[in-house]
Regions:
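"…together with the soluble PPM/PP2C metallo-phosphatase catalytic core" -> "…together
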Residues: 1-198
Length: 200
């Protein structure tokens, strides 16, 4: 029941927030103009994906507040902070633009800090820090690339979320189950928006 509550909240937030956010982005002129590297051919609104992060963060917060995640709560908190920071960086990139060097450097810093925090919390070897840092920075870039392909971001997020949720159930890791479920729910709700690419 608590898992359904958290996932449901993530779903509703990700589904409904774009209704209010898209008009704001239109007024601000946050647009993606197609070029030779683009995967789309029409002008689309940028930055709407931050509503997915809002849904995931709401779901994770509820997993802590309701007691769904009773142990390893610090892992959920670290994940939430990492998601919030990465989403903020992505929003700044969409809204103002960042140089490749600055963006890559900040992504790497996020990866280092996030992985180090997880390694310390989970009492793992610090050799995982460089691996995790590169993996996180690389994954953010892959996600950014997929963002312009019709529907692939939503489908990918659902698949990854379900995979982690199932892994959490099989491994009896409540934090992983909760994180996977709210991620899948948030991306599922955003899929109709992602399929439309939100043309102006």
């Amino acid at each position: 029941m608590l898992l359904a509550l958290c996932a449901g909240a993530a779903f509703l937030a990700s589904l409904l927030l774009p209704f209010g956010f898209i008009p704001l982005l239109r007024r601000l002129g946050v647009l993606d103009i197609p070029n030779e590297r683009s995967s789309h051919t029409k002008v689309v609104i940028r930055g709407v994906g931050v509503t997915i992060a809002a849904g995931v963060l709401l779901g994770l917060a509820l997993s802590l507040l309701t007691g769904l995640v009773a142990v390893d709560r610090s892992i959920v908190l670290i994940l939430a902070l990492l998601i919030a920071a990465a989403s903020l960086l992505g929003w700044i990139e969409d809204f103002r633009g960042l140089s490749v060097r600055v963006r890559a450097g900040l992504q790497l810093v996020l990866g280092i800090v996030g992985t180090a925090a997880l390694v310390w919390t989970m009492e793992q070897s610090y050799w995982w820090v460089p691996v995790g840092a590169l993996a996180i920075a690389g994954y953010i870039n892959v996600a950014n690339f997929m963002d312009g392909v019709n529907g692939i971001s939503g489908l990918h997020g659902i698949a990854v979320g379900v995979l982690y949720a199932v892994g959490g159930v099989l491994g009896d890791q409540a934090w992983m189950t909760a994180a996977g479920a709210v991620t899948a729910a948030a991306f599922a709700a955003f899929l109709p928006w992602n399929l439309s690419l939100i043309h102006i």
